């Protein structure tokens, strides 16, 4: 008896546990779904769907979800809202599915199916029959007026542009901007979004691809509000203004079934094949430009598998209840009970009771007002009990839109069903399949890669992060990072074609141009608004004995041997004014004989000092092991900030640097321990007249103005303008995306360095990169006469080179005179 009671108790406990578990499972089931709509008309159709679902709630059984509609104004807005979980699902063109998946982690969970069970469209080029007799092959597409659905649509933009790049002679003008490439190829056209921020990131697109667009309302031209937006809009554009329209194979027949175009015969149009021949509209299987997947329903990948499963079951039931795969759009029973206007701006476009009027705000809050759907019901006989009782049955159709004033709302009108995408296939790559080759192919660049040469491990780390950041946005050419032993090595590798670019100080721009035919093509810009900076001498405020006109016996801190601010300008000043003995043009010996101790990174390297090495030139340097006195970021006292650090903690009396360095490193702007207690007022500028000035007074108290650091590449016989333009293009887009200063652990900034490091690749003071005009892309033209004169004073080889050039010119002049 006791054992029986125990058994009963165990069974009861088990049942309670199972029931409780089921209760908790039900508790965690999602109960609602928010649908993001992309227009006012689509919002109205969605609201009609919510009422239909509420009426037929019993037919959904356990798969029912409370559906609400969230209105946006474009696919991009919906992608943004779903990514931030303000909405749950929307339908997207295959081109937008790529964008949503690649950049916002959205995934496709269901796909539309067309008549016959097909899940693909053919991309076709449509022309008016008998037009364009001069168009015999794809190369003849140049200078034609073209109608595109929108920039980024797979069938209407990506496939045609990709095809013309490979077969139609369309040259890539901008590796990272398809709109510029298309604008240089076609005549005036209409491609909606060609001036949007997304497709015009640096704001220099031509409006050529918006010229045919016809939007009138403010903000309506060349946007989703333009009458020529979408596949149906591109069809209208072809009828009224264009030579060619890129459409889906179903678009023409869909449009000819509408009231607006029902009097136009299908044979008014024909397809343009890739081989130049023409074909009938229905011959799209043999005459198309490529195959693309049908539209998909997407949601956030952050949604659980359980949520996605519920969405699929709910949407599948909607498609079953509210679709008619065999319907005839022209003779649908009860169809006349709907408002079938085609233009949403027509008099009755807002329905019998104006209840989808965007200016009637109450409709946004009262989604279930009965009068709103009065026009969506028809009177039918009750077929269940055989009586003549009249009952209103809703005639809602999920794959029909013309009653709402516009076609293809929520779903394409050519769709007949929805198919579930299995969990393992819920990614944009698997959904797109082979069509993804069109998307990546359109982004190919005639210059495949750009190799950046750096000189330290820290710079290499930053370069790799930069490569990852650029790759995330699919920017081309691909960035490759290469670390070399020194800047001289980088010059040699660039000249030999083993590297492509590097960022050099003005002194290295000189060396690279003189000895290796390198040319500067982009320069950094600091706080002056021009690619230049002031060279300043800085001393401590509590060290009044240090004076610029007499530094004998002092300890000095320099940015590096042969650098402009840290060596060439100050040494030229001292030598030219007779403050130190010149020893001919041997500035290293002059400094070693005059200063007691210094840190001049690179001073004992035979790459930079071909004369006698003086150990005192590195006595203040801080690098350990092989890093000691190296002319790169591995030496802690290298560069402008390194020279300032040498002054702060390394025993220096004076440091030579650019005018922004002190302000960048004091007042808590740097977190490193050596800079924590440093304030602007602790330091002063040394002026050439022996006086001092405040740090901010650099315009009056300086050693001269020098050109900013520059990005260099090959010149001379190896000069390649296509490559240079591709490098300029990549760096321009890179700074647009990553030029900000405010960074965190999860973001990248081109013009910032990690805590503990400074001026990696680019100067931390950089605000932007500026393209150097073509007439300044020689080292001497860029650097200017002041720098060239200073270099001749401090560098024996510079003087010899200049002398040889002058003698050569003199001989040529004499020969000409004799002739």
UniProtKB/Swiss-Prot annotation:
Q: Which residues are assigned to the propeptide feature?
A: 797-819
Secretion signal span: 1-21
Name where it's found.
Answer: Apicolateral cell membrane; Cell junction, Septate junction
Q: Where is this region: Disordered?
A: 325-361
Instruction: Quote the record's binding site residues for Fe(3+) 2.
Output: 505, 533
- Which Pfam families does the entry mention? Transferrin
The UniProt disruption phenotype note reads: In the embryo trachea, dorsal trunk airways are tortuous. Failure to secrete verm/vermiform into the growing tracheal tubes, diffused luminal chitin and tube overelongation. Septate junction permeability is impaired, septate junctions proteins Nrx-IV/Nrx and Cora are abnormally spread basolaterally and strong reduction in paracellular septa. Adherens junctions are normal. Levels of ferritins Fer1 and Fer2 are normal.
Disulfides per UniProt = 36-78, 46-69, 147-237, 190-213, 273-287, 453-490, 463-481, 557-646, 599-621, 618-629, 687-701
Q: Where is the composition biased (Polar residues)?
A: 332-361
An example of a Gene Ontology BP annotation on this entry? septate junction assembly
Quick one: effect of changing residue 533 to F?
A: Abolishes iron binding and endocytosis by epithelial cells; does not rescue Nrx-IV/Nrx mislocalization and tube overelongation in trachea of knockout embryos
- InterPro entries (alphabetical): Transferrin (IPR016357), Transferrin-like_dom (IPR001156), Transferrin_Fe_BS (IPR018195)
Q: How does it sit in the membrane?
A: Lipid-anchor; GPI-anchor
Instruction: Write out the GO MF terms.
Output: iron ion binding
Function (record text): Iron-binding protein and component of septate junctions that form the paracellular permeability barrier in epithelial tissues. In an iron-dependent manner, required for septate junction assembly during epithelial maturation in embryos and mature septa junctions stability.
- Family membership, please give it: Belongs to the transferrin family.
Q: What is the protein named?
A: Transferrin 2
Species for this entry: Drosophila melanogaster
Q: Gene encoding it? A: Tsf2
């Amino acid at each position: 008896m006791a054992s029986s009671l125990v058994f009963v108790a165990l069974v009861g406990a088990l049942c309670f546990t199972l029931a409780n578990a089921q209760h908790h499972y039900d508790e965690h089931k999602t109960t609602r779904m928010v649908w993001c709509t992309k227009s006012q008309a689509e919002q109205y159709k969605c609201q009609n769907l919510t009422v239909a679902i509420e009426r037929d709630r019993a037919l959904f059984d356990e798969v029912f979800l409370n559906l609400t509609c969230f209105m946006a104004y474009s696919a991009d807005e919906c992608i943004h809202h779903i990514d931030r979980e303000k909405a749950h699902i929307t339908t997207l063109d295959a081109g937008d599915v790529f964008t949503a998946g690649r950049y916002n982690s959205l995934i496709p969970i269901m796909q539309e199916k067309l008549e016959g069970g097909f899940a693909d469209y053919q991309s076709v080029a449509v022309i008016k029959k008998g037009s364009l007799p001069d168009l015999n092959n794809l190369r003849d597409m140049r200078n034609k007026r073209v109608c595109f659905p929108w920039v980024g649509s797979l069938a209407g933009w990506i496939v045609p542009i990709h095809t013309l790049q490979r077969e139609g002679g369309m040259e890539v003008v901008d590796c990272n901007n398809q709109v510029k490439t298309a604008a240089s190829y076609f005549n005036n056209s209409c491609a909606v979004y060609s001036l949007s921020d997304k497709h015009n990131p640096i704001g220099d697109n031509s409006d050529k691809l918006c010229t045919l667009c016809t939007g009138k309302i403010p903000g309506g031209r060349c946007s989703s509000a333009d009458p020529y937006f979408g596949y149906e809009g591109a069809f209208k554009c072809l009828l009224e203004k264009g030579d060619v329209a890129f459409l889906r194979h179903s678009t023409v027949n869909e449009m000819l079934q509408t009231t607006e175009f029902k009097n136009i015969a299908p044979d008014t149009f024909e397809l343009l094949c890739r081989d130049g021949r023409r074909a009938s509209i229905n011959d799209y299987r043999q005459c198309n430009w490529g195959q693309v997947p049908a539209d998909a329903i997407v949601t956030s990948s952050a949604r659980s598998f359980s949520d996605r499963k519920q969405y699929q079951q709910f949407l599948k039931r909607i498609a079953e209840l509210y679709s008619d795969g065999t319907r005839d759009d022209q003779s649908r029973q009860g169809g006349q009970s709907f408002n079938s206007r085609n233009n949403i701006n027509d008099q009755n476009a807002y329905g019998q009771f104006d209840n989808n009027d965007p200016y009637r705000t109450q409709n946004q809050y009262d989604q279930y007002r009965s009068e709103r759907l009065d026009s969506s019901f028809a009177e039918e006989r009750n077929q269940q009990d055989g009586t003549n009782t009249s009952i209103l049955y809703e005639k809602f159709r999920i794959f029909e839109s013309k009653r709402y004033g516009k076609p293809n709302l929520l779903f394409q009108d050519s769709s007949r069903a929805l198919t579930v995408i299995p969990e393992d296939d819920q990614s944009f790559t698997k959904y797109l399949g082979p069509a993804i080759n069109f998307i990546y192919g359109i982004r190919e660049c005639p210059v495949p890669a750009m190799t950046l040469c750096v000189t330290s491990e820290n710079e290499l780390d930053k370069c790799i992060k930069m490569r990852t950041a650029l790759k995330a946005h699919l920017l081309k050419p691909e960035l490759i990072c290469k670390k070399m032993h020194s800047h001289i090595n980088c010059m040699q590798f660039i000249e030999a074609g083993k590297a492509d670019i590097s960022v050099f100080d003005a002194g290295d721009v000189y060396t690279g141009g003189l000895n290796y035919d390198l040319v500067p093509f982009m320069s950094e810009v600091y706080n002056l608004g021009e690619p230049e900076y002031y060279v300043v001498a800085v001393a401590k405020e509590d060290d009044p004995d240090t004076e610029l006109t007499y530094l004998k016996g002092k300890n000095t801190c320099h940015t590096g041997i042969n650098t402009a601010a840290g060596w060439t300008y100050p040494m030229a000043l001292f030598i030219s004014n007779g403050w130190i003995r010149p020893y001919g043009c041997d500035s290293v010996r002059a400094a070693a004989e005059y200063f007691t101790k210094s840190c001049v990174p690179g001073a004992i390297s035979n790459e930079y000092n071909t004369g006698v090495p003086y150990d005192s030139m590195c006595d203040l340097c801080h690098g350990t092991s092989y890093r000691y006195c190296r002319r790169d970021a591995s030496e802690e006292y290298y560069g402008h900030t390194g020279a300032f650090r040498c002054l702060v903690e390394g025993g220096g009396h004076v440091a030579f640097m650019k005018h922004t360095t002190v302000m960048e490193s004091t007042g808590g702007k740097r977190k490193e321990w050596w800079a924590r207690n440093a304030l602007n007022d602790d330091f002063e500028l040394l002026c050439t007249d022996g006086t001092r000035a405040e740090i901010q007074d650099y315009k009056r108290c300086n050693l001269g103005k020098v050109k900013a650091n520059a990005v260099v590449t090959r010149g001379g016989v190896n000069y390649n303008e296509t490559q240079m333009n591709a490098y300029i293009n990549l760096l321009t887009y890179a700074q647009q995306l990553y030029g900000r200063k405010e960074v965190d652990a999860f973001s990248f900034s081109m013009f910032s360095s990690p805590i503990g490091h400074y001026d990696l690749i680019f100067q931390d003071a950089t605000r932007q990169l500026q393209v150097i005009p073509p007439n300044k892309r020689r080292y001497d033209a860029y650097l200017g006469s002041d720098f060239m004169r200073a270099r001749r004073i401090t560098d024996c080889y510079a003087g010899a080179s200049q002398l040889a050039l002058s003698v050569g010119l003199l001989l040529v002049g004499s020969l000409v005179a004799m002739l």
